[in-house]
């Protein structure tokens, strides 16, 4: 069957063999954006960082569903699909970078079932929210909601927003929802607010969760983040070494494990 694709402007195309990560014969492809504010990244090195340094190869499990919120150019979605072979729902509300994500998912459809969603994931359904860049011509950015108190940069657009549960039910089958095993959230400081507003849905699945420790958080915001994590009955670990995380010792990301699954995870 013939397929036609729109090819975005690409600076460099890469392939990587995932045999060294325990997936013999699995080859994935990633395409570096030709954008003035996109720094150079080698695909193999990026995979090594995610899968080895951040231990994703110990977290991603075969034939599961992964939710990738903040998909950008596909640098996280591709290794997620390569390692699971299941379903990857990757979410990118920024229309400037989404063509690279869509192209990467099309070129890697032999790895997994990829679904690209265009909505922002927010704390309530059917809202319009502002996406603003970091002064980088929409290469990256985050949501601006003045009730959340976090802003971004120079260029802004309005994007539709839905809750995590609504997003999953909109794009996934019931079987795929039941197989959700990992949720990665990178929403520039709103990660725990999204979890807090989706606590019943999260508790029904109790997946592993990866969130960003937003670099602009002050001590009070970090404490509030840890309070939300604890209220969800999750435990925060540092992904590089699986040690218990502390609100006074920042990390780029946090790995969240439901308390009922912690002993099995650490065993």
Regions found by a protein language model. Give the residues of each.
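Short internal loop-to-helix segment that lines adenine-nucleotide cofactor pockets
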Residues: 43-67, 125, 144-203, 217
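Short, glycine/acidic-enriched loop or turn micro-motifs at the edges of active sites
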Residues: 71-73, 95, 123, 187-189, ...
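Hydrophobic packing residues within well-ordered alpha-helices of enzyme cores
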Residues: 80, 101, 131, 194-198
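Conserved acidic-Pro-Pro-aromatic motif
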Residues: 86, 90, 167-267
């Amino acid at each position: 069957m013939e397929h036609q694709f729109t090819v975005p402007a690409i600076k460099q195309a890469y392939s990587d063999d995932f045999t060294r990560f325990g997936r013999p014969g699995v080859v994935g492809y990633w395409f570096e954006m030709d954008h003035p504010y996109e720094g150079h990244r080698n695909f193999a090195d990026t995979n090594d960082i995610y899968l080895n340094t951040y231990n994703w190869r110990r977290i991603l499990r075969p034939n599961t569903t992964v939710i990738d919120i903040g998909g950008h150019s596909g640098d996280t979605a591709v290794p997620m699909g390569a390692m699971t072979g299941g379903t990857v729902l990757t979410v990118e509300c920024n229309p400037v970078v989404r063509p690279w994500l869509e192209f990467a998912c099309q070129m890697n459809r032999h790895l997994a079932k990829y679904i690209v969603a265009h909505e922002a994931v927010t704390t309530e359904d059917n809202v319009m929210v502002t996406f603003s860049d970091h002064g980088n011509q929409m290469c990256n950015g985050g949501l601006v909601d003045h009730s959340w108190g976090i802003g971004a940069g120079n260029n802004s657009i309005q994007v539709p927003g839905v809750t995590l549960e609504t997003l999953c039910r909109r794009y996934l089958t019931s079987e795929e929802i039941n197989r959700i095993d990992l949720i990665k959230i990178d929403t520039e400081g709103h990660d725990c607010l999204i979890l807090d507003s989706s606590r019943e849905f999260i508790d029904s699945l109790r997946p592993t969760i990866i969130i960003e420790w937003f670099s602009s958080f002050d001590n009070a915001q970090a404490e509030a983040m840890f309070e939300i994590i604890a209220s969800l009955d999750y435990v925060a670990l540092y992904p590089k070494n699986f040690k218990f995380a502390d609100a006074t010792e920042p990390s780029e990301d946090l790995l969240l494990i439901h308390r009922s699954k912690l002993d099995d995870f650490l065993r």
